[in-house]
Design a protein with these regions (language model features):
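N-terminal Rossmann NAD(P)H-binding glycine-rich loop of SDR-like oxidoreductase domains
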Residues: 4-24
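NAD(P)-cofactor binding segment of oxidoreductase domains
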Residues: 69-116, 132-142
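Active-site "gating" loop of Rossmann-like NAD(P)-dependent oxidoreductase/epimerase domains
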Residues: 106-129, 145-148, 165
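Conserved beta-loop-beta element that borders a ligand/cofactor-binding pocket
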Residues: 139-167
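Glycine-rich Rossmann NAD(P)(H)-binding loop
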Residues: 162, 190-196, 224-231, 240-243, ...
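Substrate-positioning beta->alpha
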Residues: 170-178, 190-214, 221-222
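Conserved C-terminal active-site "lid" loop/helix of NAD(P)H-dependent oxidoreductases
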Residues: 203, 260-293, 314
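Mid/C-terminal beta-alpha module of Rossmann-like enzyme folds, strongest
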Residues: 212-271, 304-306, 316-324
C-alpha cells in the first residue's frame, strides 16, 4: 500500500483510476477543483481524502507544487499538467522527498507518422500548443529522472473515450450528427477517402496503465503509449458503428474544401487535427514493461460512449434498436 495523490482526480481517467487504487489498497488523496464529482459514482470514493485546489490559480501564485508536497505523497499521479512551467514547479517541490511521479502525456507528442506503428523511440515531431507542450514536459521529466531527481514515468494516451462525455466520432470530430447518420443510413461525409487514422482508448484502460505504473520500477524514466490494441481508419470506424444497427455505412468521400464547407470550419479543423497526424501507436513496450493489457477495442470504447450519449439525450439514433439504450 502507498499514499497516492491524484491530481485531476474526478476527470475522465480519474473517474476509473481512483476506485482502482482504493481496491488495490492504496491510501488515495484526490485533488480537484471541487466543482463536480466523478463521471460515475462508486462506493470507493467514500474511502478517499478529497482536497480542493485550483491548479491554474495556484500555479500562477507559485503555491501548487508546495501544496502537493505538503500532502506527503509516496506517489503522485498528475493527470492535468499542460505546460513545462507547471511541471517544473511540481518537480522542484517534490525533489526533496522524491515520490514517484506518473505524468499523463498524449500520443500527440508525435506529429504526422512516418512509420507505423509509431514507437516511443520515434523523434518527437509535435506541433500545436497541446502536443508541443506535452513533448516539452516529457523531456523535462526524463531529464529530471536522469539527474537523480524525482523519478518519473510518462504515459501517452490516445483519444480517451467512454461513457460520460462526448467522444471523437468516426468523422474525426465531436459533432454528434455522425452517430445519427450512421444509425439511420444517411450519408456521412468523410475527407480523404476516409483513410485518416484514429487511435482511441477506453478511459478504464488508461486507468489500468496508471495503476500498473505504480508497481513497475523498470518503468521509471520511460514513456509508454496507452491505446487500444489497434487503431482504425475513419471509414473502418464508420463501418463498425453502422453494423451495430444492421447497416452498411453510406459514405460520401470529398476533398477538404468541400468537407470544410459541409462540416463547418470548427468541426473540420478538429478532424484535420486528428487525421493529419494519423497516429497508430505501438503498445509493445507498455505490454512488456507495465503488463498493460487493454480490455477494450476502439469500437468497444465508442459503443459504451454512444450508449451513454443516447441515454443522456446527446445523440439521436432515431428508432433504431441499440444494446444498452
Amino acid at each position: 500500500m502507498s499514499r497516492v495523490v491524484v491530481i485531476g482526480a474526478t476527470g475522465h481517467i480519474g473517474t476509473y483510476l481512483v476506485p482502482r487504487l482504493v481496491d488495490g489498497g492504496h491510501e488515495v488523496i484526490a485533488v480537484s477543483r471541487g466543482t463536480r464529482g466523478p463521471y460515475h459514482a462508486s462506493p470507493q470514493w467514500d474511502a478517499v481524502t478529497r482536497v480542493t485546489a485550483d491548479r491554474e490559480a495556484e500555479d500562477a501564485a507559485g503555491r501548487f507544487g508546495d501544496r502537493i508536497a505538503a500532502l506527503r505523497p509516496e506517489a503522485v499521479i498528475d493527470l492535468i499538467c499542460f505546460t513545462p512551467a507547471s511541471a517544473r514547479q511540481l518537480t522542484e517541490a517534490l525533489r526533496p522527498s522524491r515520490p514517484l511521479l506518473v505524468h499523463c502525456g498524449t500520443i500527440w507528442v508525435h506529429g504526422p507518422a512516418l512509420r507505423v506503428p509509431v514507437t516511443e523511440d520515434e523523434p518527437r515531431t509535435a506541433y500545436g500548443e497541446y502536443g508541443t507542450g506535452k513533448a516539452e514536459i516529457e523531456a523535462l521529466l526524463n531529464q529530471e529522472t536522469r539527474a537523480g531527481g524525482v523519478p518519473a514515468v510518462v504515459l501517452h494516451p490516445g483519444h480517451i473515450s467512454g461513457p460520460g462525455w462526448p467522444v471523437i466520432t468516426p468523422a474525426g470530430n465531436l459533432d454528434a450528427a455522425a452517430w445519427t447518420q450512421l444509425a439511420t443510413g444517411r450519408p456521412l461525409t468523410l475527407p480523404d477517402h476516409g483513410l485518416g487514422v484514429l487511435h482511441h482508448v477506453h478511459a478504464d484502460d488508461v486507468a489500468q496503465a496508471f495503476e500498473l505504473a505504480l508497481s513497475r520500477p523498470a518503468a521509471i524514466g520511460g514513456s509508454f503509449h496507452v491505446v487500444a490494441e489497434q487503431a482504425m481508419t475513419l471509414r473502418g470506424l464508420a463501418a463498425g458503428v453502422a453494423r451495430w444497427f444492421g447497416r452498411e455505412p453510406v459514405l460520401d468521400f470529398v476533398g477538404w474544401d468541400e468537407f470544410t464547407r459541409r462540416a463547418g470550419p470548427g468541426d473540420a479543423e478538429v478532424t484535420r487535427e486528428h487525421t493529419f497526424r494519423s497516429i497508430t501507436a505501438s503498445i509493445a513496450r507498455a505490454r512488456e514493461v507495465l503488463g498493460y493489457a487493454p480490455r477494450y477495442s476502439s469500437l468497444d470504447a465508442l459503443r459504451e460512449a454512444l450508449a451513454w450519449l443516447v441515454a443522456d439525450g446527446q445523440a439521436d439514433i432515431g428508432d433504431q434498436p441499440f444494446p444498452g439504450r
